[in-house]
């Protein structure tokens, strides 16, 4: 770890020289990248300085304890040493996270797609519950939340729901929500009080930046159909052909949007989803080819992987990837997801750091 820290501190000095060059302002994109790197490395240096200072205090307290005779002073020093050890441990965890090179996608916004799976109506209702959960979480984080597409079920809830979430740290915290979410509870229609199990799938697609050169879509590769929007049960809710279906012919990816009354707005939303899906498909393909990259993730990120179980009768939520169980499902469903998302991020960073150390050893 010490070797990595020294490498980053040297890089910080280089970045400070580069960013102080007046010519850097002629290249806004480069300046933006350097500014972000400078902020990250500065945080690392500040944390490292705090670790060194705390370890010095700890060392001094231990030396004083070895020579102290007064019982009250001994008790005070022992208490200080215990709290000092806890603080050093906490700072080292922060330092570990900062030592992991950032994912270039960390600053991207995301498109989340929730779909009802096994369980029929109950699964659709749980999609609705999770939509609300993510909406509340986004609000608590100060993120922008946007409905891109929604297909309601006949009894409430959604067969499919697509949302856009934007803000600082969105992708970093939400990326591990991808997978199968299983719910165990007694449906309102159940007269015998039996617990039913159903499931939904969640996809988290980083939304390509406007200047992303990797995602190029040629207009001639698109088949665009327009039709009248319909609501639950199939009834038409608009008398104009405002709904849009876009098919990307080379990949076969199909996106439908019908929530806006404007055909133009529906097309714009459909294109955003299409770009994100095409980009995600390419990333999934690369990950399958690079098994080393796969093993560094928390779980596979596969849509079919069961990642979490929500047991309502026990007020329990379990994340199977890291063995985390909380008996506060009621709070989680109200958008209190920080304990889960932070634990997943920390676990993933620790894995990446370990893999990096193994490669360098």
UniProtKB/Swiss-Prot annotation:
Q: Does the keyword Cytoplasm apply?
A: yes
Instruction: Tell me what this protein is called.
Output: Peptide chain release factor 1
Q: Which SMART domains match?
A: PCRF
Gene Ontology MF term list: translation release factor activity, codon specific
Localization, UniProt: Cytoplasm
Q: Which Pfam families match?
A: PCRF, RF-1
Q: Name one GO cellular component term.
A: cytoplasm
Q: Gene name, please?
A: prfA
Q: Which keywords belong to this entry?
A: Cytoplasm, Methylation, Protein biosynthesis
Instruction: Quote the HAMAP family the UniProt record gives.
Output: Rel_fac_1
Role according to the record? Peptide chain release factor 1 directs the termination of translation in response to the peptide chain termination codons UAG and UAA.
Q: Which PANTHER family match?
A: LD18447P
Q: Where N5-methylglutamine occurs, residue numbers?
A: 235
Question: Would you identify the family this protein belongs to, as annotated?
Answer: Belongs to the prokaryotic/mitochondrial release factor family.
Q: How is it modified after translation?
A: Methylated by PrmC. Methylation increases the termination efficiency of RF1.
> What SUPFAM superfamilies is this protein classified in?
Release factor (SSF75620)
Whether Protein biosynthesis counts among this entry's keywords is yes
